Amino acid sequence: MGRRFHSFRWRKLILPGILTASLFSVSATSHNAQETGFDLAGKPVDPLKAANGKAVVLIFVRTDCPVSNRYAPLIQKLSDEYARRADFWLVYPDKKEDAEVIRQHDREYGYKIPALRDPQHALVKLSQAQITPEAAVFDASGRLAYHGRIDDLYVDMARSRRAATTHELDDAIKAALSGKNLTLATKPAVGCYISDLE
């Protein structure tokens, strides 16, 4: 996919992605059942079981979402920064995006993060994700500690700040790595809605 988007595609795929929920905390949820996506070779992968005791960060993206594409440099930067202590995965929840399209997208935007397809939305449900881009952070025990926006760069789909003033994903990773008993936190994301399975 290129960086240009046809207007009809924009109207179809990009909706005002601010969720109505506000910031809240509840008990962190644990990962019990096997939840898998598929790597680009079609092999099932459970990113939490593959972590070997590290924190896990899932970033939900899609190839044709301009908001998530704008975040690509920051997502890669955070992955590089935390590489020794956290596993990052790009998760593509749109079942229409095949492996070759995803490979092309990752090359175009400079991603070096492993990618997973999530056509059955197993990881979407596990992470409670609704938007791309949206991040989910799991601590080393597999508990979901955070899901929501990466930062507050976008006010809504039509407005963005010159620079972010809060950095929720970075803060959530630091908290997950602290080893403290965490509660689940969330912050509304702005972007493209994840479509329901047809």
Task: Explain the meaning of each model-derived region.
Residues 69-109, 117-126:
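Structural microenvironment flanking redox-active thiols in thiol-disulfide oxidoreductases
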Residues 1-10:
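N-terminal secretory signal peptides that target proteins for export/translocation
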